[in-house]
Amino acid sequence: MKKYNIKTTDVELLKKWYYLMTLGRALDEKAPAYLLQSLGWSFHAPYAGHDGIQLAIGQVFTKGEDFLFPYYRDMLTALSAGMTAEELILNGISKATDPGSGGRHMSNHFAKPEWHIENISSATGTHDLHAAGVARAMVYYDHKGVVITSHGESASSEGFVYEAVNGASLERLPVIFVWQDNGYGISVPKKDQTAARKVADNFSGFKNLKIIHCNGKDVFDSMNAMTEAREYALLNRNPVIVHANCVRIGSHSNSDKDTLYRDENELAYVKEADPLLKFRRMLLRYKRLTEEELKEIEEKAKKDLAAANRKALTAPDPDPKTIFNYVLPEPYEPEKYKDGTHRETEGEKKFFVTAVNETLKAEFRHNPNTFIWGQDVANRDKGGVFNVTKGMQQEFGEARVFSAPIAEDYIVGTANGMSRFDPKIRVVIEGAEFADYFWPAVEQYVECTHEYWRSNGQFVPNVTLRLASGGYIGGGLYHSQNLEGALATLPGARIVCPSFADDAAGLLRTSIRSRGFTLFIEPKALYNSVEAATIVPDDFEVPFGKARIRREGSDLSIITYGNTTHFCLNVAERLEKEGSWSVEVIDIRSLIPLDKETIYESVKKTSKALIVHEDKVFGGFGGEIAASIGTDLFRYLDAPVQRVGSTFTPVGFNPILERAILPGADRIFEAAKKLLEY
C-alpha cells in the first residue's frame, strides 16, 4: 500500500490538496453570508476541523467504480471528490441547476448522482443502509468498487447504523463506514452518546469487520487510513470502519450557538487544532512549498470562488409549476389486459397465496435482475410465515432469494440501495413477517417515497414492498393492523390492495415491472380463502389506478377494497333478496393512484355512497374518498356519504372483541340499509 507523508508525497499533489482545502474553507466561511443576504443557504453545517478526513474521502473515491454517500457536513468531501465550487453553491442557494436535486433538497446536501455521489437524507446515518444495498449489488455483479458512507460519530447511536454494520459484516460487503468524530451530537457530548470513548470500539466484536483509527485532522494519516480501507475492502470484500478523530471548530450549524455549552478553553483548543493551518505550517516547515507558492494557491482559490459565486447567482430558480414532477414515475402499462379484467372461465381456481407465489416465480424468470429478501422467506421447506415464497430459493438460488435479519430498517434500506446500482434491478421485499411489525422501518419507507422527487428524477427505487396485513384471523393487537391509512399520507408510493387471487397476480406483476416504489398489501385472511380464489390467466396484468366493478347496481354505491370486499358482496346480495335493492360494489384495488372516474360514475348513477374498509374509520383512507365525493359530487348526492370501518381502538385477541372491533357483514348491512332508506 502506498504511504503518504510530508517528505515524499509529490509536490503537485500537495499543491492540489492545499488548493482544495483552501477553496473548501473559503466556501465554508462564506456560506453563512448567503443567508444574511437573503440568498439562501438557510442550513449550513461547517466542516472546519474535519479537513483531513474529508480531503481523504474525496481523494480515495474513484469515479466510475465507487459509490459515495456524503452527509450534510461533507463539503470538502464533495469538492475533493471532483464537484466544483459552483455546484456546491447551486445546492446551497437552491437553484434549479443544482446537480443533486434541482433546488428541491436542503442546502448543504451535496450530490452528483451521475457520478454516484448520492443524494441522501437529512436523517443522518440512514444512508449506511443504502450503502450496504449498493455493496450487495457490487458483490452479486462482480463489480470492482467500494461504497463509502460518511457521517458523524453520533449517528452510530442510531439503530439503523448498527443494522447496516451488522448486515455488511454478515454478508461480507465492501462498505467503508467513515465516522467523523468531533465529539458532539449537536450539543450532546460523546460521553452522553456512547459507552466507548472511541465509538468504533463498540463494534469491535463483529466478525469480518476491520476497524481503522486515524487522526481526521491530519491529511497524511487520513489519506493512509482511507487508502488502506479501500484496498482492504476491494481485496477482501469485507466492510471497514474508519474512525476519524476530528474537532468541530464552529457550531453544529447556523442555528446552533456552541458558546452555550463549550467553555473558553475548549474553543481556544479547537481553533489551535485547525487542520488547514497545521497543514500550511507543515508545508513550510518541511520546505515542500514556499510562502509565495502558498499565497499563489490561496489567491487562485479566492478568484475561483468569486467566479463560481458570480455564475451560481445567475442560475435560474426552480419553477414552482414543476412541483408535481417526479412524484411517481410512469408505470408499466399492460398491453393485453388494459382494464385489468379477463374473461377466463376455464381452468382451476387458485388461492390468493398460490397466485402470488406463481407470479413471483414467473417474474423472476422474466427478469433475471429480480431479487427478494425478508424475514423467513428462504427456509428450505418454508417460504415466509404463510409460504408465499415457497420453492423460490430452490429454483433461483441463494443470491437472489434469501432471508434477512429481523431488522426491518435493513430489509427496506438495502432494497433502496441495491436498486441504485442499476435501473434494470427489481427488488421485492417482505418488509416484515406481519404488517404490524413494519413500524420500525417507516423512516426507510419515507426515504423510498422521497427519492424520486428529492433527486429531481435522477433516481427512483424500483422496489415492491409486500406486507401481510389485516385481521380476521384472531391475531390480536400485533397480527391484525392495517397501515395504509397512515402510509397513504406520504407522497411517492403507489399503494395497492387486491381482494381476489387474479388481481393479486395482476397487480404484483405490474408492480414488479414498473419503475418506482409500490406498497403491495396482502390481506392475509384471504391467502387461503375460497371466496378469494379465482381463475388466474398466466400472463394477467392489472394497471394501477383501475377499479373493478364487482357487482353492478343502481341504488347504492359501495366502495371498498381488501378483506371487506367479500363482506360487501354478500351484503349486496342480501339487500337484493330482502329489499329488492340494487347495490353496486366497487373494488378499488389501487388506493394510490385512485380511480376516481369509476367511483364518480357510479355515485352519479346511484346518488348514494358507502365506503367500507377494514382500517379504522378515524384517519382511514376512506376519509379521502368521502371528502372527494363530497367536494366534487355534492349536487349528485341524495344522502350524506357514509363510512364503515374498524372502531378507534386496537384489535382485541379474544374473538368476541375482534368481532366488535373489525367491520363485519352485519355492520355493513345496517349502514347500507340505513343509507338506502334515507
Task: Identify the role of each PLM range.
Residues I473-I559:
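Phosphate/diphosphate-binding glycine-rich loops and adjacent basic-rich segments that engage nucleotide
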Residues A26-L173, V178, P189-K207, L477-Y478:
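Cofactor-binding active-site loop characterized by glycine-rich and histidine/acidic residues
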Residues P70-Y72, A111, G125, S150-H151, ...:
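Short beta-strand segments
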